[in-house]
Swiss-Prot record:
Protein name as it appears in the record: Translation factor GUF1, mitochondrial
Domain tr-type G: 27-209
Miscellaneous information on this protein: This protein may be expected to contain an N-terminal transit peptide but none has been predicted.
A UniProt-annotated Pfam family: GTP_EFTU
Function according to Swiss-Prot or TrEMBL: Promotes mitochondrial protein synthesis. May act as a fidelity factor of the translation reaction, by catalyzing a one-codon backward translocation of tRNAs on improperly translocated ribosomes. Binds to mitochondrial ribosomes in a GTP-dependent manner.
Reaction(s) this enzyme catalyzes, per UniProt: GTP + H2O = GDP + phosphate + H(+)
Organism: Laccaria bicolor (strain S238N-H82 / ATCC MYA-4686) (Bicoloured deceiver)
């Protein structure tokens, strides 16, 4: 692989070779992120910027590569997980190194937005000129503002017939206090106005501060795993110079490493001889475990300790689910696949789990339901895993008289109706939700929130005009209510116009209980749920009907029950298959026929008493889907 000397300013891969341009002096840089609501055009704008600077080959209009979305699941779902690219642009006869530290747009990955912004001095706030300011536009704006970043407001998709740039610019002024004259109007798809974006990055965003002769101080903001080189850390050099062969130490773990490779992403990995103050790049240092690359850690030269920079709080799993192989003999392979995948996604928590119905598996913790779905799809795409995922749950807090316990597995939830359990109260996690919706759908959205146990509702008008007025609805919602079908119902009731964002708001006391499902009087542990009492009867009836549809008929009658403690709240009966035991009788007395029927009845009674119902794996697929 070609290596940059420390003063290379451009690296372009052409069809017939590699071209390098060098400068004999230090190259000024700008570190920035693109922040926006999901689907407002972050990846497309990044493609245009990379094309304009010659970092990637220019494509025809509309044929962008979505360079930031490297995973198959990211391209299919239109989401960006995490990325980092360097490019070089000339402004007023001078070359600049521009480091794009991209951020995900979905609410599940808000934690990754925070860590990306920590390595930047500026942010491009992208707003769709047809959709306007959305819920996550507001949250990412405040996140960037709190960190003191210079914000460049941009209206994207001005080429759309439905675009209303003047109205949306006024909306941004009212919501963010932004001067409309500072807003850039672009179309990332066609490239219109994107050159002005590059100029604004250089002229408006301040350069990173840092002294080249100061002791080394580098900020670790991300990492990924390479099967040959181990953990690759993405860093922002704050002060000093980092070179290949340097010995470094971690402020967090106190472990020491030697730099075996370092460089920039342009857009793929390009090794360099050094990283200077303000530059963003990658390092390989024979780090074996992802847990060693502590996000927010400060790296310094071994033997030259420095004051550590402010780090981050650890990620907190918000949604838990059991993952089991369809074939129990595949568990070792599944466990190895999960462990490998978590090397590239450190926010997933793992714990072994055993189920009498599904066998051996793992209980995984995720940042949200989209994160869970992305992880599942990556398991299937990259490791060809055939898995069953149980219904998602959230971490509940069980308060006893002498202690508190966090429980994320329904099978471990105590029977609150049992006085001997000594449970003082149950608390559930809640979130502060923000919903932006056109006025005509406001009533439906209020009803949706109330049906999902929303509290402390308030609202305000964001804007008004000839076309429509939009309302921001704020409320406190139980996390368990939004990990199921809340988002789908939100989009359905608003015809797709509502946007949704939330943040953790701690725990609140709640009236919850464990619902068990019994087949022939025996509980199925993999189907246990934790349900609020207001929804127990409806959920119980819904699930027993689902079970009734998918369980194969037996030779004896099978009662299907939903129970809270010892109280049965819903029941369906699966009728027995009838075998004609009198078919072989060609005559004789009536009592002979009755004797055969009585023997059959007695046999079925014994089978019902002794028999167990084995749910086929196909039945679990149907039951654990969201289909009713």
């Amino acid at each position: 692989m070609e290596e940059f000397p420390c003063d290379v300013i451009r690296y372009e891969a052409y069809v017939y070779g590699v071209c390098e341009f060098r400068l004999p002096f230090f190259l000024p840089s700008r570190n920035f992120s693109i922040i926006a609501h999901i689907d407002h055009g972050k990846s497309t704008l990044a493609d245009r910027l990379l094309e304009l600077t010659g970092t990637i080959q220019k494509k025809q209009a509309g044929k962008n590569e979505q360079v930031l979305d490297k995973l198959k699941v990211e391209r299919e779902r239109g989401i960006t997980g995490k990325s980092n690219h360097s490019m070089i642009d000339k402004f007023k006869g001078k070359d600049y190194l521009l480091n794009l530290i991209d951020t995900p747009g979905h609410v599940d990955f808000a934690w990754e937005v925070s860590r990306s912004l920590a390595a930047c001095q500026g942010a491009l706030l992208l707003v769709d000129a047809s959709q306007g300011v959305q819920a996550q536009s507001i949250s990412v704006f405040h996140n960037a503002k709190e960190r003191g970043l210079k914000i460049i407001p941009i209206l994207n998709k001005i080429d759309l017939p439905a675009a209303q740039p003047e109205r949306i610019a006024a909306q941004m002024q009212a919501t963010f206090g932004i001067d409309p004259s500072d807003i850039l109007h672009i179309s990332a798809k066609t490239g219109q106005g994107t050159q002005e974006v590059l100029e604004a990055i250089i002229s408006r965003i301040p350069p990173p501060s840092g002294r080249i002769h100061a002791p080394l101080k580098a900020f670790l903001f991300d990492s990924f795993y390479d099967r040959y080189r181990g953990v690759i850390s993405l860093i922002n050099v704050q002060e000093g110079v980092l070179r290949k062969g340097d010995k470094i130490s971690s402020c967090h773990t106190r472990k020491k490493y030697e730099i075996t490779e370092l460089g920039i992403l342009h857009p793929e990995e390009v090794p360099t001889q050094s990283l200077n103050p303000g530059q963003v790049g990658y390092i390989a240092c024979n780090m074996k475990q992802s847990s060693e690359a502590h996000i927010g850690d400060t790296l310094h030269r071994a033997g030259e300790p420095v004051e550590p920079m402010e780090g981050f709080q650890e990620t907190k799993a918000m949604v838990f689910a059991g993952v089991f192989p369809v074939d129990n003999s595949d568990f070792p392979k599944l466990e190895e696949s999960i462990n490998r995948l978590t090397l590239t996604d450190r926010s997933v928590t793992i714990q072994r789990e055993s189920s009498s119905a599904l066998g051996q598996g793992c209980r995984l913790g995720f940042l949200g339901t989209l994160h869970m779905d992305v992880f599942r799809q990556r398991l299937e795409d990259e490791y060809d895993a055939n898995i069953i995922i149980t219904a998602p749950t959230v971490p509940y807090k069980v308060v006893y008289h002498d202690r508190e316990v966090i429980i994320s597995n329904p099978t471990e939830f105590p029977e609150v109706t049992d006085a001997t359990a000594r449970v003082k109260e149950i608390q559930e996690p809640v979130v502060k939700a923000s919903i932006i919706v056109p006025e005509e759908y406001f009533g439906d959205l209020m009803e949706l929130c109330y049906s999902h146990r929303a509290e402390d509702l308030d609202h305000r008008y964001l804007d008004s005009g000839a076309v429509s007025s939009r309302i921001m609805l704020n409320c406190i919602l139980p996390l368990s209510e939004i990990v199921t079908d809340f988002f789908d119902q939100l989009k359905s009731r608003s015809s797709g116009f509502a946007s949704f964002d939330y943040e953790d708001a701690g725990y609140r006391k709640s009236d919850l209980a464990k619902m068990s499902f019994l087949l022939n009087g025996k509980p199925v542990d993999a189907l246990a749920l934790i349900i609020h009492r207001s929804a127990q009867e409806a959920v119980g009836r819904q699930w027993v009907k689902k079970l009734h549809k998918v369980i194969p008929r037996q030779l004896y009658e099978v009662p299907i029950q939903a129970a809270i403690g010892k109280k049965v709240i819903a029941r369906e009966t699966l009728k027995a298959m009838r075998a004609d035991v009198t078919a072989g009788l060609y005559g004789g007395h009536y009592e002979r026929k009755m004797k055969h029927l009585e023997n059959q009845k007695e046999g079925k009674r014994k089978m019902k008493k002794m028999g167990t119902i084995d749910l086929p794996q196909e039945a679990f697929f149907d039951i654990l889907s969201n289909k009713s």
